[in-house]
Every structure is written in structure tokens, then in C-alpha cells.
From Swiss-Prot:
Coiled coil: none annotated. It comes from Buchnera aphidicola subsp. Schizaphis graminum (strain Sg). Zn(2+) 3 binds at H182, D229, H231. This is Probable endonuclease 4. Belongs to the AP endonuclease 2 family. InterPro entries: AP_endonuc_2 (IPR001719), AP_endonuc_F2_Zn_BS (IPR018246), Xyl_isomerase-like_sf (IPR036237), Xyl_isomerase-like_TIM-brl (IPR013022). Endonuclease IV plays a role in DNA repair. It cleaves phosphodiester bonds at apurinic or apyrimidinic (AP) sites, generating a 3'-hydroxyl group and a 5'-terminal sugar phosphate. Binds 3 Zn(2+) ions. Its cofactor is Zn(2+). PROSITE patterns: AP_NUCLEASE_F2_1 (PS00729), AP_NUCLEASE_F2_2 (PS00730), AP_NUCLEASE_F2_3 (PS00731), AP_NUCLEASE_F2_4 (PS51432). Keywords: DNA damage, DNA repair, Endonuclease, Hydrolase, Metal-binding, Nuclease, Zinc.
Amino acid sequence: MNYIGAHVSSSGGLEKAVFRAFQIKATTFSFFTKNQRQWISLPLQKKNIEDFKKACIKYNFSPEKILPHSSYLINLGHPIDFFLEKSRVAFIDEIVRCDQLGLRFLNFHPGSHLNKISEVTCLSRISESINIALEKTKNVVAVIENTAGQGTNIGYRFEHLYEIIKKIDDKSRIGVCIDTCHLFASGYDLRTKIDYESTFNKFFDLIEMKYLKGFHLNDSKKQFNSRVDRHENLGLGEIGKSVFKWIIKNKNFHNIPMILETINPKLWEKEIDWLRSLQ
């Protein structure tokens, strides 16, 4: 079975995210567990947690198939110690929130070197940050998202993801989420069956299947290898629709949450219906 959904708003309460996912006929979803534009948020109250869990039961969402996203403020490879520590504290808080909500995963962007340290040093800082967070928390798997390589963001090569994972102490709590727009923008082609197979062969040459915990299914507004992160609705961008058919039909990817972050939410239900029809 494919679990297909979108990144929905949690405005008005976390339980509202569950209902919004239900409205678009999703079987999974992504959301922010706190205001992603703020470093510090009030702790989750008992009622917040209970309302969210009740909504998941009511609308038939399995907590281990939900893929929440961390704040974009967090930079686990920050070159300045003050901001690195701030990011680490915020990351730990987000993992704790996921655990309180009964969720298994936390998806996050690895970080950026800001042209102040080398990529190698940045990757080491990211691994160290994850190790610190995992040591201070429990249960939740930290899921690294590949990036488009825009600006000074790290994580745009499979080798980057491999190097991060290699240094993680508790490998049962680390995973990867593949964003198709980011793949395409960072130089991994997906437009033909040969290119799609070549890209995923390169991925699995470095990273075992067991680490793949999620997909972000997005077309790209920008051209191949642009290193620019601009999502587009499926089939309306530079990638085209074919790759999404191949991903959905790949039995190795069944039971993995697949999240739309396409730019027009009004099309999400239609996109979910189309993806589901391919199963």
C-alpha cells in the first residue's frame, strides 16, 4: 500500500492538521508541530496531545506513517557555535514534541556551511548535532531530507547523506527522505526511465533501503541542475509526470509516506487521487 498525502497547515491546533489531511483524502501527511518561524514555542499541553491523538484515531491516520517537518530555522551544521547550540536545542525540542504526540519520525533539512566552514566540517557538525539530540531523546527517528543545493545548503549529494549517516551512533534512529524536486535541481535526472533507475541505483549504492523513510513528491519549476529549490505541481514543471508513476509502482517504496509539497493546495486532492490510481 502507498501512503499518500500533503504538507498541511496546523493553524488553529495540531488536530486541525489531521482534519485537513482527511479532507483531501490523504492517508499520510506532514505538518509543523510548532510555529516554524520561531525558535521557542510553548510546550505542548496535555489537551493538545490528546486532541491530536484522538483526531488521528477518528480519521484513521497511523502515527508511524505521519512525517512531521522541523523548523527551517534549524541549522545543525551552523559554523557559529552560538547559533549551532540554538539549533541543537530547538531540534531536541522538536523531537520531544514528536515523541509526545506518538509520532515515529521527524523530517529535517541538514544545514548550511554559510561559506564559513568546509562542507566536510559542516557534515561532521551535522552528525554530531544528531548524535547529541538522539542521546537526549527517545523513540523518534531523525529523517534527513536531501536538498537542492541552493546557496550554501548541504545535503545535495548522496555522498553527503552517506557521510552524515556513517557517523551516527544509533543507526536505528536515522533515516532519509527523498525530495524529487531537490533531486532534479541538484543534478540527479528523473525524466526518463533510464535516468530514474540510474539515480536510484546511485542512491542505493551508498545508502541501504532500510534508511529510506519518506518521499516528498514535487515537480520542479526550475530547469535540471539549477540548484534552485522551486516546487511545482505534478506534471506542470520540468520533471514531468512519468517519475511519479515509477515511484508509486515500485514495490520497494510501498508503505513509505509520500508527501506532496506542490505549490497549489487546491490541486492536492486531485493529485492524491491520480497517484492512488497508479497503484
